[in-house]
Amino acid sequence: MEIDNRSRRLGDELKKIILPHSQVKMAAATFSLYAFKELREALEEIDEFKFIFTNPAFMVDEIKEQYREYAIPKAEREMALFGASYELKLMNELTQKAIAKECAEWVRRKARFKTIKVDEPISDGVRIECGSNVFSVDRLKNFDLKELGYEASTLKTRRNLYEAPNSLDYLAEFEDYWNDNEYFRDITQEVLDKLNIAYKEHSP
């Protein structure tokens, strides 16, 4: 199935196929909590969520935490956790606080994040496994509102949603990446730390 985010939006299709007890695997350059908000109902019902940043993120030499550092982070892909500029314009501070809290609670229960440690290209996309059903999306540059089709994009981009058996080849190497401790590392706690900063920053 072709998805152009005009006649058919990626987010709507993902809501249909992210079923209870699914395992969701994503590889993308950025993760936005506003994209999480759009898929939250479906993501609350899954068993496991694994996300790989396809570019180095949260590297040790970049982390010098200050209370407001998240507002102007060193790395754009880390800033995207709190929304791209167009997403931030859509949300007031109370909404941002609520979403950050919900996302942090969900991450603690369901999600793990890893990042590649070297500047080497790897495949991006989505793989959803539920029993014998496997769905895949062949491209996912960023996990954000624009990529999901909920914010207008200047240029039309196409991606494809596959069912088995065509879906089986996409992100087949994901677990190899996930279990590779030499070139990938777990950053789940760093993601939680950033979300906690956002929540505290917007607390009265």
Indicate residue ranges for each PLM-predicted region.
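PLD/PLD-like phosphodiesterase catalytic module centered on the HKD motif
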Residues: 1-204
